[in-house]
Amino acid sequence: MSVSNKKSIDMTSGALWNKILLFALPLAASSILQQLFNSVDTAVVGRFASSQALAAVGSNSSLISLMINLFIGISLGSNVVIARYIGEKSEKNIHAAIHTAILVAIISGFFVMIAGQFIAKPVLLLMGTPEDVIDLAVLYLRIYLLGMPFIMLYDFGSSILRSTGDSRRPLYCLIVAGVINTLLNLVLVIVFRLGVSGVAIATVISNIVSSSMVIYILTHESEPIKLELRQLKISVKELKKILVIGIPAGLQGMMFSIANVCIQSTINSFGSSAVAGSAAALNYEFFAYFLVNAFAQAAVTFTSQNYGAGEYNRCKKIFRISLVFALVLCGILSGIFVMGREFFLRIYTTDADVLVFARQRIIIATTLELLTAVYEISAGAMRGLGYSLLPAVITCVGSCVIRLIWISTVCKVVHVFWVLMIMYPISWVITGIAMMTAYYIVRRKCFTFTH
């Protein structure tokens, strides 16, 4: 059995370093492009609509992030399961897992879309959305939620493609959809003056485009990756396997979102200059982190395929190569941002007070962003081996609970911005040590048991 095509990567034989690099870089590019497109969305609505429209879109960001992180995590479960079956050369199971994943995407997408129409306003009120923007915020969210089935189809469909080693075609779909989204934003907001509605409609249409492209690709693949729409049905066995991996990963993403809301509240306590400065520096942290996350996803998929194929020594090499790439490339990019911080930060602001806070964040957090590679790659390798709950628990404790304890104790006593910022590298070190230790224990258990 073969799932190879000119876009896929043979993960179970040959040199690893070049294949991991070829797989990870398009993933990093996808994340970076998505961030850039989101920035364009914000710029268009802020510049050509109104401050209320900008606030309405912004007030939804944490809630939308919460939902997206949950389902991206669940889609990771399908990636791991299908990659394992590819390694095992189990054609029947690949077919069942793919059709289960796509049907789960459709059902859950429609469920969130419908339920969201009823709970949009209560949830936004619960989050403390200001009265002067609540109506616009509800309007934006309700329109945005109409695209949830398509968001889910893209996430699950691209995860299926990545399980074969194909990370380029999901990138191409994202580029096309992102360009369409940007153009529609300009037309609907500037020409037709639809404001918040225009931004939301543009997002829905772009999600329809990206998901349609991914589904088209899958329906025109060769067996056993080929998607047959008439054969869509849920296999309980495959669903359980997908959820065992996916739910812990999704809940981890949700915990991150909740913790970030609390951290943002502490940043807010330092005033508007701190909020603006932190936001400016955070953009560069995102770009550096996207490299780490891409190699973590590579570790998941490569490890899962090779573990399924019984290539245990390659699993060890995958961990080492992914970690080195993530550390080096993230370190180089972070170093460029830190050394050129005056130039990069002034792209966003020239306000002297804002720059004071921006410099503190970029010097402390961005400089040490490469530390995230230790726990991200270790967690990715464990998920590839089929362990998802353990890395989720370690990450939640190390990167969420510890940070919340820090801001509720240390920052209460020493209310200084840089003291808040050192919370990040401290939590990264603690989480990294715990995660790498757990990885070696899990690896020894897996390889000893299978032998």
Task: State what each model feature region is.
Residues 49-62, 137, 141, 200, ...:
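Small-residue hotspots at the loop-to-helix junctions and early N-terminal turns
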Residues 36-55, 124-131, 187-194, 254-287, ...:
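Helix-terminus/linker motif at the lipid-water interface of multi-pass membrane proteins
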Residues 54-114, 151-170, 264, 277-341, ...:
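Small-residue-rich hydrophobic transmembrane alpha-helices
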Residues 75, 144-162, 170-181, 199-214, ...:
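Short runs within selected transmembrane alpha-helices of multi-pass transporters and secretion channels
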Residues 1-24, 82-147, 180, 191-247, ...:
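Short alpha-helical transmembrane segments in multi-pass integral membrane proteins
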Residues 13, 17-36, 40, 63-70, ...:
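Residue-level signal for short hydrophobic patches within transmembrane helices
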Residues 42, 51-54, 91, 120, ...:
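Membrane-helix interface/capping residues of multi-pass secondary transporters
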Residues 22-41, 143, 177, 206-210, ...:
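Transmembrane helical elements of multi-pass membrane transporters/channels
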